[in-house]
Amino acid sequence: MAKDDVIQMQGEILENLPNATFRVKLENGHVVLGHISGKMRMNYIRILPGDKVTVELTPYDLSRARIVFRTK
């Protein structure tokens, strides 16, 4: 699967949801559902409400995102 068509954006975690999903507010004001990427899951990266994150959106479904990086 090609990763050339993903859209990377910055966001902030609003709340935790079940099954390692989160409600993320993007920098443009939209609120999306985000799930943790596999590498973050393998390395036990903890994400809490208020954390700044980098998410990847696919152009096919702009209401869901993959959380790929947590900034300090």
UniProtKB/Swiss-Prot annotation:
Keyword S-adenosyl-L-methionine in annotation: no
Domain S1-like positions: 1-72
Statement: the UniProt record of this protein carries the keyword RNA-binding: yes
SMART domains associated with the record: S1
Intracellular or extracellular location(s): Cytoplasm
Keyword line: Cytoplasm, Initiation factor, Protein biosynthesis, RNA-binding, rRNA-binding
CDD domains noted in UniProt: S1_IF1
GO MF term list: ribosome binding; rRNA binding; translation initiation factor activity
Entry superkingdom: Bacteria
Entry's Gene Ontology cellular component terms: cytosol
Family matches, as Pfam families: eIF-1a
Recorded family membership: Belongs to the IF-1 family.
Function noted in UniProt: One of the essential components for the initiation of protein synthesis. Stabilizes the binding of IF-2 and IF-3 on the 30S subunit to which N-formylmethionyl-tRNA(fMet) subsequently binds. Helps modulate mRNA selection, yielding the 30S pre-initiation complex (PIC). Upon addition of the 50S ribosomal subunit IF-1, IF-2 and IF-3 are released leaving the mature 70S translation initiation complex.
Subunit structure: Component of the 30S ribosomal translation pre-initiation complex which assembles on the 30S ribosome in the order IF-2 and IF-3, IF-1 and N-formylmethionyl-tRNA(fMet); mRNA recruitment can occur at any time during PIC assembly.
Protein name as it appears in the record: Translation initiation factor IF-1
Organism whose genome encodes this protein: Herminiimonas arsenicoxydans
Gene: infA
